[in-house]
Amino acid sequence: MDSKSQSYFHSSETGKPFEDCISCGLSLKEDPDLPFLVAKTFQGDECIFEYAICEHCRANMAQEFSDESQQALATFFTQRVRLEERSQLLSPAKLIEPWIQQCAACDTPRSKAKSYSLGGILLGDTIIYDPYPLCLCGDCEEEIQSLLSQQTLGIWDDFVQTNFDCPPGQHQDLPNKGRPALL
């Protein structure tokens, strides 16, 4: 992976790879076989929110989501992101840019989106392809948020409030009504 590709999933604050899981504090280098998600939200070219979370913590949080939300997310990603079609089209290319150049759900070019989020699954310094990496524009993120149950929104709000400096309602710059992207 070239340095430009790596930088998509490095911390915008430090310019370096994320070191720890935001939820449990595990060093992301401690277990080289444990994948982790990097999620970053941008307003224009400015990264306004970012985190890395290990697969254990990500899976545990997802299990807490209501059945209704889990089904809504699965339906959204199956119908709107068209995972199989995306996989067949992009899998042969092990380059990040084709995967994130446009919104995975509505095809809006990333360069034209007022806000967007990037998500990538990494194993050490290596990006894991299919279905990630992906880009979601702010409009599609808002649509996803509207599909979630109050229970799931509460779990996500608790995650944000626990791990970031201000409560979710105070994230004024975020495109999706005060909540960062749920990737």
Q: Each predicted region: which residue ranges?
A:
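Long compositionally biased, domain-poor regions of proteins
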Residues: 52-56, 60, 101, 108, ...
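Short, intrinsically disordered terminal segments enriched in charged and Pro/Gly residues
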Residues: 1-13, 63-97, 146-183
